[in-house]
């Protein structure tokens, strides 16, 4: 008996079927997008940050202080009892804040780094203050609103800047965190200007920073911060 050769098209189809296996209906189910759950009193959800601090002015230069941590299903308040302290000029929207007004900018801000007398155990980038550590506030300087490590700062620059060791000695900057206000591309004058907005210890008022009136709570806050969790501070007027 003479066998007839099979058509090449049929052979190709059979080979493909053998490789793929039996057909079955395809079912594709898209994963549901996580639902944003906002930290109390803020518009920050766990999709943006899992560490949120809230400083809410209630009257004068004082207000409430809270730290919230996302535990995977809900926000948990983790701070010790403490009050927030604000600039003696009050709290203003960050877009309206101007240098030299002693006002605290309101808004939601990320953080740059921590600093002080020694790392208390934080995962944040940390700088130790020395006798030659300055924070430059002179608008004419290239490193305006930046740390400068120099033992020979010109008098004209020093007059409008802060020698950080002086504030360490007074207890205010033993531990502190740089708040990312007017930092990335700083405005040197006009609206949304000003330098050196920190989180630090304070009792009654600040020059525009956010203060905590408990050194133990401040130290615990610095230790708690983890850049992998994208911490933010929410300042409310």
Place the predicted regions along the sequence by residue.
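Alpha-helical hydrophobic/aromatic positions enriched in membrane-embedded helices and signal peptides
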Residues: 99, 205-206
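Active-site nucleophilic cysteine motif
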Residues: 107-108, 206-213
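Secretory targeting and sorting signals
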Residues: 1-32
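Conserved structured core elements
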Residues: 8, 212-215, 219
């Amino acid at each position: 008996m003479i066998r007839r050769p099979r058509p090449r098209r049929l052979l190709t189809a059979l080979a493909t079927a053998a490789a793929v296996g039996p057909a079955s209906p395809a079912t594709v189910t898209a994963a549901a997008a996580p639902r944003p759950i906002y930290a109390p009193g803020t518009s920050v959800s766990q999709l943006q940050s899992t560490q949120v601090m809230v400083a809410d002015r209630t009257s004068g230069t004082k207000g409430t202080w809270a730290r919230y941590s996302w535990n995977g299903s809900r926000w948990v308040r983790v701070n010790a009892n403490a009050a927030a302290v604000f600039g003696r000029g009050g709290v203003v929207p960050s877009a309206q804040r101007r240098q030299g007004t002693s006002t605290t900018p309101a808004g939601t801000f990320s953080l740059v780094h921590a600093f002080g007398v020694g790392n208390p155990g934080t995962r944040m980038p940390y700088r130790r203050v020395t006798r030659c550590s300055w924070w430059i506030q002179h608008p004419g300087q290239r490193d305006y609103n930046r740390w400068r490590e120099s033992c020979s700062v010109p008098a004209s620059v020093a007059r409008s800047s802060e020698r950080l060791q002086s504030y360490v000695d007074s207890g205010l900057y033993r531990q502190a965190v740089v708040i990312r206000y007017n930092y990335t591309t700083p405005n040197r004058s006009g609206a949304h200007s000003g330098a050196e907005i920190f989180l630090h210890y304070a009792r009654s008022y600040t020059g525009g920073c956010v203060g905590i009136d408990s050194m133990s709570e401040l130290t615990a806050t610095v230790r708690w911060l983890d850049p992998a969790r994208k911490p933010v501070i929410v300042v409310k007027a």
